[in-house]
């Protein structure tokens, strides 16, 4: 008998959802940085064996939206509550159960198994962990609580064991050689955006969107032209940097990661353009592929 199911990962920003999904899939599907709101889209990672297919979904961190981009990000997270066969709610040892009460109420109403994963337990002690488990049990009494450390890979095998037990009997939903639902261009934009998140401070990384305008691939190499959109002329200057040095650093580091990702030589050209207030524009968000009501 073949098993297949959708395992959706939700939770607040910066609790380790993307790191966990990459571990579970065994491939680097989602970018993961130390900054909150790194993930903007719902991203599928597909794990295949002879008798099983697990379709994981990484989602943006749950937050109260301040502009339309964040509304779209919340839509991705809420949609993951609807179509899951198993729901992974990821928290950490700092977060309290009463955060985001509205979203937690929606989690309580799902009618599928919920695994509540307390991540980063390497940063706390046993006494505090026991107290936290009790608090989460009061918040989600039907959930199965598993303390983990994605960074140390502690108990991740236990999570996978429970997922395999919980997903239903079903034929596969995707081809057995398929790793994700996203095209190659998407991963180019994410890798470039990851470098921007790592190398720039404050609001700059959050005002950035990346679009691949050219992607030409042959047997040995890929030629890529990418545009980095910002909201202000001042942001454009910061991204480019003095004599273009900042942008060159981003492009160089992105190229290295892309070569590892695609296992081909990468020729990357980057440009910076201003798209004023794109994060608050329905039209621009739709053009950039975000989900709106």
PLM regions: where:
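Conserved, well-folded catalytic cores of nucleic-acid-processing
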Residues: 27, 46-50, 84-87, 94, ...
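Catalytic P-loop NTPase motifs of RecA-like helicase/translocase cores
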Residues: 39, 62-64, 96-97, 124-125, ...
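Conserved G1/Walker A P-loop phosphate-binding module
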Residues: 1-75, 79-81
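Conserved glycine(s) of the Walker
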Residues: 16, 155, 246
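Conserved C-terminal guanine-recognition region of P-loop GTPase G domains, centered on the G4
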Residues: 51, 75-143, 216-218
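P-loop NTP-binding site
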Residues: 184-293
């Amino acid at each position: 008998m073949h098993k297949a199911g959708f395992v959706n990962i939700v939770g607040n920003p910066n609790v380790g959802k993307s790191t966990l999904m990459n571990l579970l899939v065994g491939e680097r599907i989602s970018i993961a940085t130390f900054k909150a709101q790194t993930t903007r889209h719902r991203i599928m990672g597909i794990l295949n064996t002879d008798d099983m297919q697990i379709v994981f979904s990484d989602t943006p961190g749950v937050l109260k939206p301040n502009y339309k981009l964040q509304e779209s990000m919340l839509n991705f997270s809420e949609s993951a509550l609807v179509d899951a066969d198993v729901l992974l709610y990821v928290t950490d040892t700092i977060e309290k159960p009463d955060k985001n009460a509205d979203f937690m109420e929606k989690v309580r109403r799902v009618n599928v198994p919920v695994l509540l994963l307390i991540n980063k337990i390497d940063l706390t002690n046993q006494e505090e962990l026991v107290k936290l488990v009790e608090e989460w049990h009061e918040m989600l009494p039907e959930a199965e609580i598993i303390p983990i450390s994605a960074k140390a890979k502690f108990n991740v095998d236990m999570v996978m064991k429970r997922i395999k037990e919980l997903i239903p009997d079903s034929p596969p939903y995707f081809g057995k050689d398929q790793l994700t639902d996203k095209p190659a261009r998407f991963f180019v934009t994410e890798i470039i955006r990851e470098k921007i998140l790592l190398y720039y401070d404050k609001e700059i990384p959050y005002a950035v969107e990346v679009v691949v305008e050219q992607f030409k691939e042959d047997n040995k190499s890929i030629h890529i032209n990418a545009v980095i959109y910002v909201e202000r002329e001042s942001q454009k200057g910061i991204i480019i940097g003095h004599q273009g040095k900042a942008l060159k650093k981003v492009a160089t580091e992105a190229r290295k990661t892309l070569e590892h990702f695609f296992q081909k030589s990468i020729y990357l050209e980057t440009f910076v353009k201003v798209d004023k207030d794109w994060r608050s524009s329905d039209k621009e968000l739709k053009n950039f592929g975000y989900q709106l009501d």
